[in-house]
């Protein structure tokens, strides 16, 4: 969206990934205490909804959005994304024996790559659909509509985490 719809230079767009990475790094030391305090179920349910809302809120971004606001938005998204992935990874692997940990990690990596591939394909399909619907002269609207759809889909997936027993140990 930043390059295609807003016309930003690749270098500028790349610089905006720095706050995302910083958010991810910032979250690392706080994830374990958060999970210990609130539990996997609550963290994953809440965080999935927050990630979805954050994705959808990218639709509020325009070419005129101040850089400091974009940086904060990307920082928050990086933080939430990191909390999500670390929580899912540790929940998935925590009860595996040492013998099964390697296979479990490989299987988890494959599932994550598959889900990311499906996400990219879905995003491309939505952008294509909305570009055809709104026309190429309204590319920003097509991106915004796609982001809202992707955010809503992400929020719906929180239902999966409602199946985690509330007393799941850390």
Task: Outline where the language-model segments fall.
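12-transmembrane solute porter fold
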Residues: 1-133, 138-168
């Amino acid at each position: 969206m930043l390059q295609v719809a807003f016309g930003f230079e690749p270098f500028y767009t790349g610089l905006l990934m720095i706050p995302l990475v910083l958010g991810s790094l910032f979250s690392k030391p706080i994830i374990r205490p958060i999970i210990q305090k609130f539990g996997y179920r609550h963290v994953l349910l809440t965080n999935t909804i927050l990630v979805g809302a954050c994705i959808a809120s990218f639709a509020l971004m325009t070419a005129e959005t101040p850089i400091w606001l974009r940086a904060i938005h990307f920082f928050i998204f990086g933080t939430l994304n990191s909390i999500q992935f670390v929580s899912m990874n540790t929940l998935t692997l925590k009860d595996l024996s040492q013998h099964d940990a390697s296979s479990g990690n490989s299987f988890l990596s494959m599932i994550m790559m598959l889900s990311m591939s499906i996400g990219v394909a879905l995003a491309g399909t939505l952008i294509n659909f909305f570009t055809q619907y709104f026309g190429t002269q309204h590319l920003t609207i097509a991106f915004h509509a796609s982001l809202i759809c992707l955010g809503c889909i992400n929020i719906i997936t929180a239902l999966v985490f409602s199946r985690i027993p509330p007393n799941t140990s850390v």
